[in-house]
């Protein structure tokens, strides 16, 4: 009986089935509770399990419920009161969030490895590091109501693997004013040999750079205005050019490092929006990697900015009603978990249709919309037992099943909408009275229609 129902969903709602299978592979309930038990410090499970909290937050991230309160009210067997639920959410420790992101990425990585893909730099695993500050929350907490300034619930440092399109690690910071450089030392301590870290100038400090060097990892970091003091500087040598400008290179040495590092200078053909005409990169990559390759690799760092935009706009990572720092950070971490699942779906659909549509770029937004449209009905029609086997399925079996489902997806329905560059509009002076004036859209349209020859 259930197989017939599942077959109909496979044909008519393949994205929702793919999402459910991927979620079961990445975040099975039993595994979440095990991670919580192993990572918690002072928090106790009590009656409400951590898996139930993550399930509720995922419903909000995927757009299946408008808020945590609405998701909790629709949950049939919530074992605690709403007050107890919010107390649990407000006490979720950052160490638990990090363990969930690390573990779920590790569970999805073998499935991603079954799919086609090329490494950005042969022999190296890319890691893009950047920070994301959560916006000001509503002042619902009593101590915040008398504060005139914005209430910032915290920030996170995120590590992104662009080759596998997975967020592999995060560090959640409850103090919104805590230095990113200080927090980054936690991530650098976990760096491994064979990794190549990309970071902006904010992370150009001797402690971080030497940390990567000692871990036998490589780095490409943009030079900061107050960079570590240089003990040695070689002569500048021509290094060709890349797509955006002319390259030169020199060797540099700092205190405590016997082997010199590399300093790449890029003189841009056109200035940036901020008026910059050149930028400099530091790297400890071997000479076999050319300056052009280093410059092109650093340009990939901007992919994490697009990641933050998609997590915010598509997966509701910034829930302003959650004012407690730990609750807001839980919302962001859950959105990251959902993003990794959608990244797997995106890669599967693109590979399944590569022969027919080689340039297909699947939109994360349209994927999320597709999931929302059919997911609720699928959960009603099929019992939880229909999915439990996927939590222990092999990566090969999971990838094959997802690719089979992906062939039922219409590429046109999930493709990214292409648009041309925006045309700049002149911003002249306008009287304040004209700005405040209201107009009737219907009258303006009628007037414009009458003026058209």
Predicted regions, residues:
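Short, charged amphipathic recognition helices of the HTH superfamily
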Residues: 63-76
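Single, function-defining residue in the core of a domain
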Residues: 1-64, 79-92, 100, 104, ...
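A short, well-structured juxtamembrane/interface segment
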Residues: 108-117
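Conserved mixed alpha/beta core segments that line enzyme active sites in large multi-domain catalysts
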Residues: 143
């Amino acid at each position: 009986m259930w197989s017939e129902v599942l077959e109909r969903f496979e044909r008519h709602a393949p994205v929702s089935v793919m999402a459910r299978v991927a979620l079961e592979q990445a975040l099975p309930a039993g595994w979440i509770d095990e991670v919580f038990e192993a990572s918690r410090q002072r928090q106790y499970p009590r009656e409400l399990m951590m898996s139930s909290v993550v399930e509720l937050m995922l419903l909000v991230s995927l757009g299946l419920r408008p808020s945590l309160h609405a998701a909790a009210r629709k949950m049939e067997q919530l074992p605690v009161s709403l007050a107890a639920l919010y107390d649990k959410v407000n006490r979720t420790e950052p160490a638990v969030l990090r363990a969930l992101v690390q573990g779920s990425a590790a569970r999805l990585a073998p499935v991603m490895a079954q799919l086609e893909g090329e490494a950005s730099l042969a022999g190296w695993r890319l890691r893009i590091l950047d920070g994301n500050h959560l916006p000001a929350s509503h002042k619902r907490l009593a101590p915040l109501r008398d504060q005139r300034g914005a209430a910032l619930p915290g920030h996170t440092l995120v590590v992104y693997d662009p080759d596998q399109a997975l967020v592999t690690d995060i560090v959640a910071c409850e103090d919104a004013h805590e230095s990113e450089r200080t927090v980054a030392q936690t991530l650098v301590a976990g760096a491994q040999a064979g990794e190549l870290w990309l970071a902006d100038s904010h992370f150009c400090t001797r402690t971080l750079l030497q940390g990567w060097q000692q871990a036998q990892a490589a780095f490409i970091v943009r030079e900061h205005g107050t960079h570590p003091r240089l003990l040695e500087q070689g002569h500048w040598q021509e290094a060709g050019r890349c797509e955006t400008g002319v390259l030169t290179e020199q060797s540099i040495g700092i205190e405590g490092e016997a082997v010199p590092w590399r300093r790449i200078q890029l003189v841009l053909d056109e200035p940036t929006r901020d008026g910059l005409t050149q930028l400099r990169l530091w790297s400890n990559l071997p000479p076999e990697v050319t300056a052009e390759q280093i410059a092109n690799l650093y340009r990939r760092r901007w992919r994490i900015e697009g990641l933050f935009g998609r997590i915010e706009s598509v997966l509701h990572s910034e829930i302003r009603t959650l004012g407690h720092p730990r609750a807001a950070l839980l919302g962001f971490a859950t959105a990251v978990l959902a993003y990794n699942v959608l990244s797997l779906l995106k890669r599967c659909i693109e590979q399944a249709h590569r022969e027919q549509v080689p340039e297909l770029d699947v939109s994360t937004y349209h994927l999320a919309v597709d999931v929302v449209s059919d997911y609720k009905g699928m959960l009603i029609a099929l019992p939880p037992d229909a999915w439990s086997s996927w939590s222990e399925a092999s990566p090969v079996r999971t990838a094959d099943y997802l690719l089979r489902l992906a062939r039922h997806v219409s590429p046109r329905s999930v493709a990214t909408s292409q648009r041309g560059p925006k045309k700049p509009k002149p911003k002249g002076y306008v009287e304040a009275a004209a700005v405040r004036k209201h107009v009737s859209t219907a009258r303006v349209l009628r007037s414009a229609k009458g003026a058209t020859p």
